[in-house]
Amino acid sequence: MLDRLNRKQSKERFVNKIPISTTKIDKSLEHTRRDDESNNAKRGVNPDESYSSDTSFTPTVVSGTEDAALTRTSTNRQRQGKSSFKSFFRTMSLKVNSKTRNKDRKTKEELAAEKALAELRNLPRNPLDLELNELHVASNFNEVRKIIDDIFIDENHDAASKAIRISTQNKSFSAMEKPYSLTKIKSLQTEDDYSLPITSFIIETLEENSIHADLSHNDNAITSTDILIEEEEEMEQEEEEEMLNYDDLDVISDKIDEVGAESSISTSNDRGIIANATANGPIIVGDSTESVDTSNIENRKLVVVNSTPDDHDYYATNDMNDNFITPNPSNESVETLAGVYKDFEVTNATEANTEAGKTTDINAETSNAIDAVADTENKVTAEDDATDTVNTGESMTDTTTSTTDNKNDKEVDKEVENAVDSNVTTNDTIPDKAANIDNESSSDNSIDATTANTTNTNNFNDAEVNTEATNTIVDNVTNDKFNSVDVSTTTPTATTVSGIPTADEMTNNVNTNRISTATVDSFTGKTGENYESFITNAGKDSNDNNADLKTPTNNSATTTTNTQSGVSNKKSNSKTGSSEQNPFQKKLMNYLNSLN
């Protein structure tokens, strides 16, 4: 059976671990679903009993594919136990000792490595056509963490500094920011964190983690950086994801063949990358071969190119200078690395604009310097002009002085006095007249006009004000009347009507007479009458001299009771001793009832 599975492993999936002994089934299987016609049910076997070797089921390998090629024809008893053994293998695979594992069978790590290498063989050919090292698969998760921690991230590259997501077969690891400034990551995906999913990768290291390659065994060169490829899915999902599916790789190969060799990526010869690719060019990961030329590794850069099914390619480098490989697709339909190429062009344009801006700033500073020099020259010229003016003034003064000296002192004084008097007279008379005339005429006219307008405005406004005041007075009067009625009828502090006690008096009187809460019949009122008589005669004083509130004497007559003069008129059918009560009596009844 095992040999048959080994022959089928390239096309079908199989259970990875099969226990040697099946004489005892785990008790957890007692909860598995069984048909009522199960052989166990017919034989009456207790699920807790151990199965003997002659009644145990033959292990049935279950295929997860639709055609179920490995599901062999079996008896009814074997078919009934198929689901049980499926769960059984799943449970026992966690308990099987590693020594019981079939040594001929490949481990999951080895199968994952084969899948990764198969994907790499089907990647598009690289521009430099370098060789790719065969991956060395690590043996435990701790080595993977060490590798992830050694990933160098440019601390100045904010987007890439967040995290690099490395997607291996089904497992994703996140490498957090490290204090290195070596690797810059770019991706075609427009994601915020610039995640770079790559199926396989080689990390170029410098001093911290250098790669030691044995060039004499180029195909089998092993680096000190071990890579673990591990599944992410749990045991239930391993049925679909744990085995290598060559059909998927064939699809990848077919899609690559459809693109055609004429659409492969080429690099610009103008940069001279091809000439120094072997000696100084970057290390390319993602070629169709299985080895990498690691010569002169200290001075070379890392480039990772990856292709995944139904996805774009990814490009990573830690250098943006001469060794940066510029993708130049020969066919516009090819999306491989096109986004990176555009980003690189944009980066160059941005840098060019930055340089142009710096040049502009320098030119502006130069212009400012020239302006400053010009200002200085103008200032000097202005100072020279001022000096010339002063000199001219001095010469004129000298001439005047010399002329004045030739005249008699008396004449000079007389001329000066006359000139002063003349000026004073002119200044005193002419401006005063002009000012008086202008001011008076303009002021008079403006004042008159303003006064007239003011008068008219005041007259008009007075009418409005009077009207508004009249309306206000009417409203206030109305409100006062309404308020007086409202206050007198609703507030307990209204003007007391003769003969009707206020609320406070009522409370005091009731408390004074000590209302009994045990029964209503025991109540003794203010006048010494019983409860019913007191309620009927409510509102009377002790002398029965209430002029405003009269108690009807006719038991059958319907009268109008004036409860409060000027406030409200209410009609009540009052009968002595009847259940009909006026509003005051109702309020009093409610109050008394509330005391009980």
UniProtKB/Swiss-Prot annotation:
- Does the keyword Transcription regulation belong to this entry? yes
Please note every region of biased composition (Basic and acidic residues): 25-40
Which UniProt key words apply to this protein?
Transcription, Transcription regulation, Virulence
Provide ranges: composition bias, Polar residues: 49-63, 71-84, 534-548
Does the record's keyword annotation contain Transcription?
yes
Q: Where is the composition biased (Low complexity)?
A: 434-461, 551-579
What triggers expression?
Expression is increased with increased iron.
Q: What is this protein called?
A: Transcription factor IRO1
Gene name, please?
IRO1
